[in-house]
């Protein structure tokens, strides 16, 4: 029989939310207790705004910051080296919007593997809502988003 200390334990801190709004609540307010609990004592996060196509990335980041004032949030789009920003992030937040645009941007910027590495190997907390949760699966083939980039 295998000893527990010989096994590889695989634990990821992932919070997937179906939506940013529930029951006419303000943006992220229904999920806020779960988000803060998931982050525990973490007070900084990198926000991936690439699913947002109807607002600027700066505006989207500001919207998330306003909804979560307890956390200092920096948009990934502001970093000179987004790969390193993901690897160094205390937590990763990925917003909703267009799943196909989000995935396209992550592929173009070569961020999929670094996000996986951060979450799997560094145990970095990940929180995604809507499109940000859709990309957690093995494929986005089952999303009901329009396939428009």
Language-model features, listed with the residues they occupy:
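Short hydrophobic targeting helices and cationic amphipathic motifs
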Residues: 4-6, 11
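Short, basic, glycine/proline-bearing loop/turn elements
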Residues: 96-102
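Class I SAM-dependent methyltransferase SAM-binding "motif I" and its flanking Rossmann-like core
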Residues: 103-105, 112-121, 125-149
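Short, glycine/serine-rich, charged loops/turns that create anion-binding
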Residues: 21, 52, 98, 133, ...
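Short His-Asn-centered micro-motif
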Residues: 95-96, 129
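Short acidic (Asp/Glu) patches
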Residues: 75-80, 108-111, 115
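N-terminal beta1-alpha1 cap of cysteine-dependent amidohydrolase-like domains
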Residues: 12-95
